[in-house]
């Protein structure tokens, strides 16, 4: 079995546990997720099954979108509801001031990850140091925020809902923290839902319970997306090469194209035969070089 599960991860579960549960449900040995989702967050968690794990890099460096709620008035150690209160503010922001500073959080900007994060510090994850009581001083790094919108503001409960679209590496908790600091009212995330990871969308995601039910029907197309689902933005060559050439690619050998082939150069392409995955290849000066070879015998469905 190989392909992708577009999982709707529940709140309160780690991404690693979600992967293990999917492996258990589908009875597979090899699986991995494309981008960690915090335990307190819910939503889209793409999980690669079997040979699809070889194309996971193409599902990581993609646009991601979130819906999140910020509670104003407090700063917490984890920048979310799990942490301890470290500071308070009586100030209540207004819609006008929130909208006024939003442009400062769009584009290429420097961001300091939360102390409780998976960022490595001298080979140790930051959250492990923070949990042991050590001071964690993380360096800022450049991140790319494409869009940030204020969706609603609950004055009575002093909280606001936002929509965020960004590239990899952005911490929503850091966005909430920095919004609160800039407004002078402090803030932390109380609710976080990921609604998009590249081509994976929340509206098409399935829960673990749904996966169990669909798996029992023995209809793979109802819960498993094809391996090439994350390769839609790269060139696809299906039934392009001869049987002998396909055999060479599968054995890791290069192919030299003759004058009959139109393609001369291609940074990266996906090669298949009869829509069965063969390899990820590069083509330079009419030489096809297999970069990733898929060990599959037939279609997933």
UniProtKB/Swiss-Prot annotation:
GO terms for molecular function: RNA binding; tRNA pseudouridine(55) synthase activity. InterPro entries: PsdUridine_synth_cat_dom_sf, PsdUridine_synth_N, tRNA_psdUridine_synth_TruB, TruB_C. Its EC number is 5.4.99.25. Keywords: Isomerase, tRNA processing. One of its GO terms (biological process) is mRNA pseudouridine synthesis. Transmembrane segments: none annotated. HAMAP family: TruB_bact. Belongs to the pseudouridine synthase TruB family. Type 1 subfamily. PANTHER family: PSEUDOURIDYLATE SYNTHASE TRUB1, TRNA-PSEUDOURIDINE SYNTHASE. This is tRNA pseudouridine synthase B.
